[in-house]
């Protein structure tokens, strides 16, 4: 067996030499060199100093600028809140524990860190799903005479919380569990063991079907239909350069959004599934740590893609940061005017990442 299982932990290293110790009580420097833990702490610090400002700024400018408080932007605020959950509930804890080389907060701290990190990650994931559905409903109009309003937006936000809790809460009440993962400095769902009484197998299968494959299918379907609708509208107005430019912009945005989702979740899901289906096989602590980096980094690049690329949000952010004046206002205004001159069903603003 490649790993050593103990009470509420699994260390991916054989204990033949007798060096394996509980990750709740002893530094894990026998897994990787101490400098690697320092590097992990530095990376977490980078995510904190970049993830907190951009997500907090999103909330702040929305409060400050009334024109941003529209139903279609509710889900973006929810995404920012989800990222802040990851920053405060996951990144800060992992940075501190990495500096010590083990999970110093014990079993209770592992449950709390695992819960908040999972809750934030799942809220972010389902926010992207709801965002895709909302854009599909608004642009493709699968339901005739449908008008997206505040009640729909609130239901979408509530749905993300329900789905996130349906993933983050069960390990706290006996369906699977949270244990230190990778380099043993952060906690996540137990993919490693088949410990009797915690039903890891059924929970992992549930996770992959409900919280990975279904979101993946929904996002591909919604954005696929959206691109087809935009291309059809652009084909009807081939003589309009503005329409063609809008079509290219929408296609580019959709590709970026889908790739970002895959970069965030595919490595983590793939490695977790491999570990689950190959229990006892050879894999090191870095094998699980690196994919988790991709998922954690989403707290930084998701706001950049879904919020900062939106012209209205970007303008308000720059205005706020520059004390009420946007030095790029003429350029932004010219771009907005050009887009408004086109009386077309192709609207990059309604399908843009924000």
Swiss-Prot record:
PROSITE patterns on file: G_PROTEIN_RECEP_F1_1 (PS00237), G_PROTEIN_RECEP_F1_2 (PS50262), OPSIN (PS00238)
Site (Plays an important role in the conformation switch to the active conformation): 113
Gene Ontology BP terms: absorption of visible light; cellular response to light stimulus; detection of light stimulus; G protein-coupled opsin signaling pathway; G protein-coupled receptor signaling pathway; phototransduction; visual perception
Biased composition (Low complexity): 334-354
UniProt motif 'Ionic lock' involved in activated form stabilization: location: 134-136
UniProt keyword Glycoprotein, yes or no: yes
Residue positions where N6-(retinylidene)lysine is found in the record: 296
This protein's UniProt keywords: Cell projection, Chromophore, Disulfide bond, G-protein coupled receptor, Glycoprotein, Membrane, Phosphoprotein, Photoreceptor protein, Receptor, Retinal protein, Sensory transduction, Transducer, Transmembrane, Transmembrane helix, Vision
Disulfide feature: 110-187
Pfam families hit by this protein: 7tm_1, Rhodopsin_N
Cellular component annotations (GO), alphabetically ordered: membrane; photoreceptor disc membrane; photoreceptor outer segment; plasma membrane
Topological region Cytoplasmic: 62-73, 134-152, 225-252, 309-354
Subcellular location: Membrane; Cell projection, Cilium, Photoreceptor outer segment
Single GO MF descriptor: retinal binding
Transmembrane annotation, as ranges: 37-61, 74-96, 111-133, 153-173, 203-224, 253-274, 287-308
Keyword match Glycoprotein: yes
Gene3D superfamilies: Rhodopsin 7-helix transmembrane proteins
Family classification: Belongs to the G-protein coupled receptor 1 family. Opsin subfamily.
Role: Photoreceptor required for image-forming vision at low light intensity. While most salt water fish species use retinal as chromophore, most freshwater fish use 3-dehydroretinal, or a mixture of retinal and 3-dehydroretinal. Light-induced isomerization of 11-cis to all-trans retinal triggers a conformational change that activates signaling via G-proteins. Subsequent receptor phosphorylation mediates displacement of the bound G-protein alpha subunit by arrestin and terminates signaling.
Protein name, per record: Rhodopsin
Organism: Danio rerio (Zebrafish)
